[in-house]
């Protein structure tokens, strides 16, 4: 038999403490050089986007 969980129990118990998180984890992969990524291959307009 499964036990009944309290309301929002996962939210209370599964939060990662901020002191154990990597401070650089929020940065994007191409943070330093915006031109490194290149054009969007699915867009005919490249980096300009389609309008």
Curated annotation (Swiss-Prot):
Domain of life: Bacteria
Chain positions covered by the region annotation Disordered: 1-51
Biased composition (Polar residues): 11-28, 40-51
Protein name: Uncharacterized protein YkzP
Species lineage: Bacteria, Bacillati, Bacillota, Bacilli, Bacillales
């Amino acid at each position: 038999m499964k036990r009944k969980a309290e309301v929002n129990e996962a939210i209370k118990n599964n939060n990662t403490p901020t002191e154990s998180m990597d401070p650089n984890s929020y940065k994007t992969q191409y943070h330093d050089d915006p031109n490194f990524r290149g054009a969007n291959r699915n867009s005919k307009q490249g980096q300009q986007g389609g309008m």
